Amino acid sequence: MASAASVTSLADEVNCPICQGTLREPVTIDCGHNFCRACLTRYCEIPGPDLEESPTCPLCKEPFRPGSFRPNWQLANVVENIERLQLVSTLGLGEEDVCQEHGEKIYFFCEDDEMQLCVVCREAGEHATHTMRFLEDAAAPYREQIHKCLKCLRKEREEIQEIQSRENKRMQVLLTQVSTKRQQVISEFAHLRKFLEEQQSILLAQLESQDGDILRQRDEFDLLVAGEICRFSALIEELEEKNERPARELLTDIRSTLIRCETRKCRKPVAVSPELGQRIRDFPQQALPLQREMKMFLEKLCFELDYEPAHISLDPQTSHPKLLLSEDHQRAQFSYKWQNSPDNPQRFDRATCVLAHTGITGGRHTWVVSIDLAHGGSCTVGVVSEDVQRKGELRLRPEEGVWAVRLAWGFVSALGSFPTRLTLKEQPRQVRVSLDYEVGWVTFTNAVTREPIYTFTASFTRKVIPFFGLWGRGSSFSLSS
């Protein structure tokens, strides 16, 4: 069968010299050249320089009579056959669809040998007992397998794309966190440098003052000592002179002179006053607050860099009807007026509590609860297991999946198996809750003074959720990271 290149070569041979396209209704003129009837008719209608001259052939320039061109039916058939060959080539019915051995079109598929056969091949002895099917029938089950494979592959590709998207988002979040921590470190150390410069100025000013006091007291000491030396030198000179005189002159007023010398007391001057010396000795103690500030700064910075701020919000689907939530779900206030809330399975119906919108399944997280208690009010903060009891009485203890502390009017209690009242330096108004899921620590600290409040130890295997309880009209709390 003709190849695609051969068909193209044949098609070039039956092109019209005028329009360069395939000949349509080919006609022959006197010189033997062929043209499309329409092309040659339009060519003859173009007037020449001499209206009396006959038109000439576009190829060889031989004159011909306008009415002398004849239809070339044989050439028209050739053109039609070539166009059919082109169509076959375009549809892909080329050499690959023809048996190389017999030149016949391939119709069958031998399932035993997995070979494509023509009619002659099928009748051959080697395939006589084999299972034969038409090509489309044989391809059908394979197409079905391909569709199944495509479905699986597309699903796996989608899963990989989802993983890629999720991990890209996670990496972007991590990059944002790193950038935030970088800015935090820069900001904290800028404040530290400012604080250190201020403290340096204060301490240097104190040292400068002490330096001035020492120099002033030195001048006073030198002046006092010089006066004493001068007076003692005068007495010594007077006695030496008296001693050199004759006896009669020596005895004149000798008693008053001796009394005056004997009663003369030497003042023992002190170069540096005890008070100034004590100030100098106490100076290192004045730097202790600076050392404490440095220690607290480093502890605070390391803690904040070590724990991931949890950007949490309150879940209105879990809040007790007596809790009023703000529009941004960052604040809750107690009210004796019940809200019109649907009684869904997630909502607390007796304990005036609310959970955060999202839970935690790993990592180290921290958040701050700012508490404003009315007289007689209380606020409970901590974490609970995701399957904590929502209906009926809620027992606040670790055995029930609750790890929390309660801040009441005037005292703080750790809600362990048995509530324990804690002794603190001051009543916290801001409590930092820090969760280390893998280690199993729930730590509470005063967010302002960083005084430790209490730490629970547990073994977490399920999701835990930040937990908040509130009681007392006018009492409220708000969240921050």
From Swiss-Prot:
GO biological process per UniProt: erythrocyte differentiation; host-mediated suppression of symbiont invasion; innate immune response
MF annotations from Gene Ontology: ubiquitin protein ligase activity; zinc ion binding
Listed InterPro entries: B30.2/SPRY (IPR001870), B30.2/SPRY_sf (IPR043136), Butyrophylin_SPRY (IPR003879), ConA-like_dom_sf (IPR013320), PRY (IPR006574), SPRY_dom (IPR003877), TRIM/RBCC (IPR050143), TRIM10_RING-HC (IPR042784)
UniProt keyword annotations, A-Z: Coiled coil, Cytoplasm, Metal-binding, Zinc, Zinc-finger
Compartment list: Cytoplasm
GO annotation, cellular component aspect: cytoplasm
Start-end of RING-type zinc fingers: 16-61
Major subcellular location class: cytoplasm
Entry annotated with the keyword Transcription: no
Source taxon at top rank: Eukaryota
Chain coiled-coil ranges: 150-177
Positions of the B30.2/SPRY domain: 292-481
Zinc finger (B box-type): 94-135
Keyword Zinc: yes
Subunit-structure text: Interacts with IFNAR1; this interaction prevents association of IFNAR1 with TYK2.
Protein name according to UniProt: Tripartite motif-containing protein 10
